[in-house]
């Protein structure tokens, strides 16, 4: 029985599950930077060598969104007209995960979901993404995100 199956079995039995979160993560997926002018932001990062990996609209939030890629670094920038435009402008760091449900259960079991966030879906990329966000001890946002 693999670790994942064993942990699912333990969860179903109501047992304490000490899961290694590293089993379900593959690294940083992207860094989120809000902007008041997405075209200016895209142009700036293109001058640094970034290429547009995806440009779309988050219709739910009425935001223009662009994912900009330079080698293995991906920046998600989104125009929300509420960016503070000051130092510390990074909004969140997203960790790429293989199984959003397992990670969510782990975060809940460890009582780390201080924001009480739930798993959301956005129709980005080919098949969409599912994600949720927690808050770290310094008020930083940590997003867990799975490409579908």
Predicted feature locations:
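Vicinal oxygen chelate
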Residues: 10-15, 19-22, 26-37, 66-67, 84-148
């Amino acid at each position: 029985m693999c670790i994942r199956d064993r942990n699912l079995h333990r969860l179903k039995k109501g047992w304490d599950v000490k899961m290694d979160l590293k089993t379900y993560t593959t690294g940083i997926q992207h860094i989120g930077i809000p902007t008041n002018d997405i075209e200016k932001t895209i142009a700036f990062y293109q001058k640094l060598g970034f290429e547009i990996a995806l440009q779309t609209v988050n219709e739910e939030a009425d935001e223009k969104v662009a994912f900009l890629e330079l080698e293995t670094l991906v920046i998600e920038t989104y125009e929300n007209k509420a960016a503070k435009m000051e130092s510390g402008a990074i909004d969140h760091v997203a960790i790429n995960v293989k199984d959003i449900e397992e990670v969510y259960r782990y975060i809940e079991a460890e009582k780390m979901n201080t924001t009480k966030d739930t798993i959301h879906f956005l129709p980005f990329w080919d098949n969409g993404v599912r994600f949720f966000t927690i808050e770290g001890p310094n008020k930083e946002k940590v997003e867990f995100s799975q490409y579908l």
